Amino acid sequence: MDYSLCELCPRSCGVDRTAGERGFCGCPDTALVAKTMLHRWEEPALAGSGGSGAVFFGGCTLGCRYCQNAAISGGPTGTPVDSEGLRRIFEDLIAQGAENIDLVTPTQFLPTILSALTPKLPVPVVYNCGGYERAETIRQLEGKVDIYLPDLKYADSALGQSLSGAADYFPAACGAIREMVRQTGRPRWNGDKMVRGTIIRHLILPGQVENSLRVLDWIGENFAPGQVLVSLMRQYTPMGGLAAPFDRRVTEDEYEAVLSWMYLNRLEGFTQEAESADAGFIPDFQQGG
């Protein structure tokens, strides 16, 4: 795995980033760190009392039109760091009391990250990604990552294309998530803190209840009860510039319909309050750290 023939994500651009070529994500061959923080808004099983040691990387392999982190994901932004510098960032967050190291949108910089994760850290490593991954890439993370936190955004290929430019999102994400669960097995705990396992996130989109039901159906059909956890999110926040129905928040009826389907599929996990759909919960990427 390297940057010289980049096939880290399903777009498989094949560019030589070491020679200055750029693919879809626009990123160089040096990791870009946009922000670090003790993140207390992750799922309770991850945030604990100390917070997740979140490392937000610049750029993204998806480019969702409604992204809350567009300030950093829309282009290659952040401070360049090599693997040694990234290791120091991890260790500093742990010294501050981080419950884990939360790698946020990391795929485009995996070669650097993998080097920084050796030797193994004394806290769990969380791979927090958009779900648009290659199973072959995820396979190379075995033994390095303890907790996978992928999105499963779309079961509808037209929706994946229109909102993220990825008509192949669903098959790619499904294959990657199967590999994640193969590696982690069922969730493992230390008290109320997860130390190993896979949490599948799904963000309900306005006007797209059917998409959400299909996503939950797939999870229920492919994993035994309790084998994975589901984090059902209602935090969609209109960011401007999108036509209806994406110019509004998710309604209570939409949320309740999806929540009922989650329970019908005997899926365990986490849910959110309506107050989460507020721009105040988006990290401030203009601040230092």
Stretches found by the model and what they are:
Residues 1-21, 186-289:
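Auxiliary Fe-S-binding modules of radical SAM enzymes
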Residues 73, 110, 132-134, 152-170, ...:
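Conserved radical SAM core fold
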Residues 53, 101, 125-127, 148-150, ...:
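Hydrophobic faces of well-ordered beta-strands that scaffold small-molecule active sites
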Residues 116-124, 175-183, 252-260:
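Alpha-helix-loop-beta-strand connector modules within alpha/beta enzyme cores
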Residues 57, 105-107, 127-131, 152, ...:
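A cross-domain feature marking catalytic cores of carbohydrate-active enzymes
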